[in-house]
Swiss-Prot record:
It comes from the Eukaryota. It comes from Sus scrofa. This is Signal transducer and activator of transcription 2. The modification Phosphoserine is found at S283. Residues 572-667 form the SH2 domain. The lineage of its organism: Eukaryota, Metazoa, Chordata, Craniata, Vertebrata. The modification Phosphotyrosine is found at Y690. Tyrosine phosphorylated in response to IFN-alpha. One of its GO terms (cellular component) is ISGF3 complex. It is found in: Cytoplasm; Nucleus. Its main location: cytoplasm. The modification Phosphothreonine is found at T812. Heterodimer with STAT1 upon IFN-alpha/beta induced phosphorylation. The heterodimer STAT1:STAT2 forms the interferon-stimulated gene factor 3 complex (ISGF3) with IRF9; interacts with IRF9 in the cytoplasm. Interacts with CRSP2 and CRSP6. Can form a homodimer upon IFN-alpha induced phosphorylation. Interacts with IFNAR1; the interaction requires the phosphorylation of IFNAR1 at 'Tyr-467'. Interacts with IFNAR2. Interacts with ARL2BP.
């Protein structure tokens, strides 16, 4: 579809722009419409911006022929009388205009450009209406920058043409001046008088063209200045985004687009600088009084140089902030003696063909004058050279991939240390880069700085160091403020909340929802706190112990973050972990669901722990909430949480195991939620010689060990109980092994004993209370907690056939006095002694319980 035809279909606001355009133009709109196809088929850009006037003259005569031809056609149709009149009128008017061919070419070229701009605006507005979500906030500004660059290029081409015409005009003047000067005629000679008159007219025309070129140069410089004022804020927006991206925020800015714009701006400025040099040379050849070009060129050149310096200094940036390879999710934290990477970039992609550019790195060029501020040296090479070949193919990028820091020794001996008012993790350091840039005779020393980094000496400091990086980049308005932690500001919750969510979205792929953020807010400020005006101090963020676990808030949250990343990432991303929910909210949610509904939440009393809570409705309408002892990473390294949930067993009164976890909150069947995580690939080539085994978690109901302080009363219809858990492996359950202490101690059972691993900790039902009073007599629990014990009580000693005769009627009543004063491990440090009938064979060291025996498949006889 022709451009004019598309313009006729626009909405009224854009039609008004089109009418306004042609109301200010010499070309009538009916002439544009009648000759639309012919006009759009011609190369008006070459005719208007080219150095050869013959192309403009040729198009001019073709245009007149086309008008004359169409006037003849219209004369045959009486209904086209008005159109015929307008065509003839424009035919006469255009021939009367001075420099008609050039004026016509420039006019139509500019009209076509404006038409295209209106058409693009209309198309963009239509897309915004159809897909408003796809429109970026800065989309309009981006299109404005693109259109301005196109306009500036057109102005530059026009200025080049004007300067070329000025050269021709000056050559004509010089030639005529030499002819006049060499002529030896009388002053009253009419021919001499005519020569002087022509020479004066030539000088007047030269002066006119000089003024036009000077005005065009000023206009171009003004437009270039405006473009810089648009580009620099876009670069600052990118830097702010980069600073927030370092602490987990999403990064939207495209650096390649900025590089394209900055390079285009620099090319235009360097080109204008070269043109001004040419104009300076022209003005020095022909000098006369009141010549504005001679003085004006120097002023314009100084302004162009100032703009170039400003652009180049701002265009030298740190593209990738310092980061150690082992902690890519936590940049700006460096460890002494460990390698780190950093990348710098010059967004003005212009380099001399034979000039290599060398960047040099340093640290703390202007350190703060504070006592105890540590000083560091860069051990590896602090220089990086960029060859023209690499610069042309990859851009002006300096990659420092193997930098290492070492602390300077204080006092000439011994290891340096920090004795200042700030701790190591609050001390901020800045790495700087310098490059000597040369292009087209302009030499500049460019400098850029990284964001402040924290330098640690031990990886144990990583968590608190990251808290410092988070706090600084969230709140600091000055990215070079190394004394920020001398008086750190408070963090408003409306900034801190999203930043905490970024930690999860960037590290584990899913941020925090409003409910989870609400729980964290209540944990920090209390449940009755208003959402407006809440702010948290730096000390409270990293040091204040928050109930109920009395753990510092950041330490507690960071341990959870590590736990999710290492063991629970898929569950977290799929939304199966509610995570941040208080115990009171947990009770409120589960109370309204059916029995067997469970949820997963993070422990508030244990670092990096996750627990499972479920609800059971009793026959007497009482509601019980059970919670498993929290699982830590030590347990989850051996047994994934998905398998724990799918294979968990709770022993009933009859010692029958059953899985009470049936529905993930609100009502998702357990196997539907977790089945996809437990699919194991079968090895068909493996000979089935052994009975398969698996680890499971087992809990017992032992109400006789339940203790509840009498002064702490639970809700009348809701009891909350906490279960200690044990890990029970198949193929044969046996004596109890406490798995977590074994894992913490690093016990290696070996492949021979792995099938026999069993942990049947006698779990205890405990009320979920913040404090447990010691030495309180056992209360009357009431009918709602009178669960049947596992074993029937006995009133008389009953002979046990499996004991030796001398131990069957042993009186244990008198031994009760030793119950709280002796420890069995002090008496028998090597474990239970073997009885006479027992064997020392390892394979027979465990006596298994049949009720805990589980297997995955049929029993297949062994060949051995």
């Amino acid at each position: 579809m022709a451009q004019w035809e598309m313009l006729q279909n626009l909405d009224s606001p854009f039609q008004d722009q089109l009418h306004q355009l042609y109301s200010e133009s010499l070309l009538p709109v009916d002439v544009r419409q009648y000759l639309a196809v012919w006009i759009e088929d011609q190369n008006w850009q070459e005719a208007a911006l080219g150095n050869d006037d013959s192309k403009a003259n040729m198009l001019f005569f073709h245009f007149l022929d086309q008008l004359n031809y169409d006037c003849g056609r219209c004369g045959q149709d009486p209904e086209c009388l008005l159109l015929q009149h307008n065509l003839r009128k424009f035919y006469r008017d255009i021939q009367a205009i001075p420099q008609g061919p050039t004026r016509l070419a420039e006019m139509i070229f500019n009209l076509l450009l404006e038409e295209k701009r209106i058409l693009i605006q209309a198309q963009r507005a239509q897309l915004e209406q159809q897909e408003p979500a796809l429109e970026a906030p800065g989309e309009n500004q981006q299109h404005e920058i693109e259109s301005r660059i196109l306009e500036l290029r057109a102005m530059m081409e026009k200025l080049v043409k004007s300067i070329s015409q000025l050269k021709d005009q000056q050559d004509i003047f010089c030639f005529r001046y030499k002819i006049k000067a060499s002529a030896k005629t009388h002053s009253l000679d009419p021919h001499r008088t005519r020569q002087e008159q022509v020479l004066q007219e030539t000088l007047n025309e030269l002066d006119k063209r000089r003024k036009e070129v000077l005005d065009a140069s000023k206009a171009l410089l003004g437009r270039l200045t405006t473009l810089i004022e648009l580009l620099l804020p876009k670069l600052e927006e990118w830097k702010v985004q980069q600073q927030k991206a370092c602490i987990g925020a999403p990064m939207d800015g495209e650096l390649e687009q900025l590089e394209k714009w900055f390079t285009a701006e620099a090319k235009l400025l360097f080109h204008l600088r070269q043109l001004l040099k040419e104009l300076k040379g022209l003005s020095s050849v022909v000098k006369y009084d009141e010549d504005l070009l001679f003085k004006g060129v120097d002023l314009l050149k100084a302004q162009v140089t100032e703009l170039l310096q400003r652009l180049l200094h701002r265009a030298f940036i740190v593209e990738t902030q310092p980061c150690m390879p082992q902690t890519p999710h936590r940049p700006l934290i460096l460890k002494t003696g460990s390698k780190f990477t950093v990348r710098t970039r010059l967004l003005v992609r212009l380099q001399e063909g034979n000039e290599s550019l060398t960047a040099e790195v340093s640290i703390d060029r202007n350190p703060p004058k504070s006592q105890g501020f540590r000083k560091f040296n860069i051990l590896t090479s602090n220089r990086k050279t960029l060859t023209p070949e690499k610069g042309q193919s990859q851009g002006l990028i300096w990659d420092f991939g193997y930098l290492t820091l070492m602390e300077q020794r204080s006092g000439g001996a011994g290891k340096g240390n920090n004795k200042g008012p700030l701790g190591v993790t609050e001390e901020l350091h800045i790495i700087s880069f310098t490059v000597k840039y040369t292009y087209q005779g302009l030499k500049q020393e460019l400098t850029t700085d990284t964001l402040p980094v924290v330098i640690i000496s031990n990886m144990n400091q990583l968590s608190i160091a990251w808290a410092s990086i988070l706090w600084f980049n969230l709140l600091s308005s000055d990215p070079q403020n190394q004394q920020f932690f001398s008086s750190p500001p408070k963090a408003p919750w409306n900034l801190l909340g999203p930043a905490l969510s970024w930690q999860f979205s960037s590290h584990v792929g899913q941020g925090l929802n409003s409910d989870q953020l609400g729980m964290l807010r209540d944990k920090l400020f209390g449940q009755n706190s208003s959402t407006e005006g809440l702010s948290l101090s730096w000390v409270d963020f990293i040091k204040r112990e928050s109930p109920p676990g009395k753990l510092p808030f950041w330490t507690w949250l960071d341990k959870i973050l590590d736990l999710v990343h290492d063991h629970l990432k898929d569950l977290w991303k799929d939304g199966h972990i509610m995570g941040f929910v208080s115990r009171s909210e947990e009770r409120r949610l589960l109370k309204k669901t059916i029995s067997g509904t469970f949820l997963l939440r993070f422990s508030e009393t244990l670092e990096g722990g996750i627990t499972c809570s479920w609800v059971e409705h009793q026959d007497d309408d009482k509601v019980l909430i059970y919670s498993l002892q929290p699982f830590t990473k030590e347990v989850l390294q051996s047994l994934p949480l998905t398998k724990i949930i799918s294979q968990y067993q709770l022993l009933t009164e009859e010692n029958i195991p059953e899985n009470p976890l049936r529905f993930l909150y609100p009502r998702i069947p357990r196997d539907e939620a977790f089945g996809c995580y437990n699919q194991e690939k079968a090895n068909l080539q493996e000979r089935k010689k052994y009975l398969k085994h698996k680890l499971i978690v087992v809990s017992n109901r032992q109400v006789d060990e339940l203790q509840q302080p009498p002064e702490l009363k639970l809700e009348p219809d809701l009891e909350s109980l906490e279960l200690d858990l044990g890990l029970a492996p198949g193929p044969e359950p046996g004596v109890g092994l406490d798995l977590e202490p074994l894992l913490e101690a690093g016990l290696d059972l070996g492949p021979e004993l792995e099938p026999m691993l069993q942990s049947t900790l006698e779990p205890v039902l405990e009320p979920i209370l913040d404090e447990v009073l010691q030495g309180v007599p056992e209360p009357n629990l009431g009918p709602e907690l009178k669960l049947e014990p596992i074993l029937e009580p006995v009133s008389q000693p009953v002979p046990e056939p499996d004991l030796p005769h001398d131990l069957r009627h042993l009186n244990t009543d008198e031994m009760q006095i030793f119950r709280n004063s002796m420890r069995i491990e002090e008496i028998m440090p090597n474990g239970d002694p073997l009885l006479a009938s027992q064997n020392t064979n390892v394979d027979e060291a465990c006596v298994f319980h049949r009720s805990h025996f589980y297997t995955d498949g049929p029993l297949i006889p062994s060949d051995y």
